[in-house]
Amino acid sequence: MESSNQFLGTERIGKLMQKYAIPCIISLLVGALYNIVDQIFIANASYLGSYGNAANTVVFPLTVVALAIAVMIGDGCCAFVSISLGQNEVPKAKRSVGNAVVMCLVSSIVLTALYLIFADTILAMFGGTVNAETYHHSQEYFFYITLGVPFYMFGQAMNPIIRADGNPRFAMIFTLAGAALNIILDPIFIFGFRWGMMGAAVATVIGQLVTAALAVWYLLHMKIIRPEKGDYRLKGSICGRTLTLGMTSFLSQISLVAAMAAINNMIRKYGALDAVFGQEQYAQIPMAVVGIVMKFFQIVISIVVGMAAGCIPVVGFNMGAKKPTRVKELFTKLLLAEATVGAVALVLVELLPWQLIALFGSANESVYYTDFAVKSFRIYLCMIILACVNKACFIFLQAMGKAAESTALSMVREVVFGVGFALLLPRFFGLDGVLYSMPMSDILTFLIAGYLICKTYRELSTKGEV
């Protein structure tokens, strides 16, 4: 049986990148906007300010845990489907989608229950006890955000699956709809009703609910890989292969959570020893500042990951169809595009940090806030070009079916280097050591990624063409 995706093996690479990467970038940017928009409105509410910002920073890694599970299932299914379609095995692709839906629903319910039961312990683990006001806001925000976890996970998991069905445009639209609603509701709930952190969270959950509802509608109207009733029965081999293919996406996100937990706790520990930030009224500033730096980084990485993840169906199809020359061409163009994005971001953080900070309510804050924020942007993101190239390498290896290499590289970056430097450098440089942990991690990771890039080119050059 021929699938309608055969054009993936014949269309110009540049055109395919535009078709698949641009909607994926927009989808990821829009998805990132949920938390970023919350933080912008929270920061500009005078009754929340840096305390609300710090609370958002505490809760953010916990939403990434949900995202990690969702993208493991969704990206794994996307890769499975793309390879299956390249081999003309459509029934297997449909079964993968059905199994992915069930795995997502079960895991989201379990995670929601765990969050509700162990909320206080979890918040303390991620630095929520920096001061009493921050902890109060963290509790409120986390409770309502947790109620939306099933909707959030389902929408995020379905996004790459919808792209694999050959409809990247709808994947973009259904995510955009939820985020647009969130942007509309945030100022109403935060400034109009003065619901504070609860208002920001409720606006987010409503947006996620709309996205999930649209994803369900599309699932029932898929073009190529709509599951039949029997496809929803879990099959061990398909679940295992899906999770294996998506493991890099999971570890990339979950290891980032480990790094953020280490960073948050080092900020809490060494901020308390600082002459300024050791004072109760300023204790939340380092946590809030690192949070806004990470939000800017999230925007950049959404573009980078969107480019690479959008190419997964193209890579998977051409690998399955034994067309290595096209895969090599795609890899080259992707690396150049990712490096360009990183270069633009570097110019912004080095030359215009004040403008970036102003988005997050600096007018309502002390000079200590602004000074530390400028320094944080310039140090923490000084190697952002390498970070972009590293991310592209992680995802491309995953798309080629090299799950072991991709997973290992991702783990080394976030856990060995990320957590390691976050714990080590503050011992010698205090609070500044936390800021230097990211560029150091990116430099060492790039040395390994460079080797894998060269190795991948050699392998693609020696593969036979069909």
What is the meaning of each model-derived region?
Residues S50-P61, S138, F142, A201, ...:
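Small-residue hotspots at the loop-to-helix junctions and early N-terminal turns
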Residues G9-L48, P61-G76, F80, L105-T112, ...:
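N-terminal transmembrane alpha-helices
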Residues K19-D38, Y144, G178, G207-T211, ...:
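Transmembrane helical elements of multi-pass membrane transporters/channels
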Residues M1-A21, V81-G148, G192-M247, V315-M383, ...:
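Short alpha-helical transmembrane segments in multi-pass integral membrane proteins
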Residues L29, L33-A54, L123-A132, I188-W195, ...:
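Helix-terminus/linker motif at the lipid-water interface of multi-pass membrane proteins
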Residues N53-A113, Y152-A171, M287-V347, L351-P353, ...:
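Small-residue-rich hydrophobic transmembrane alpha-helices
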Residues I26, V30, Y34-V37, A66-A70, ...:
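Residue-level hotspots within pore-lining transmembrane alpha-helices
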Residues S27, Y144-R163, A171-A179, A200-A213, ...:
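Short runs within selected transmembrane alpha-helices of multi-pass transporters and secretion channels
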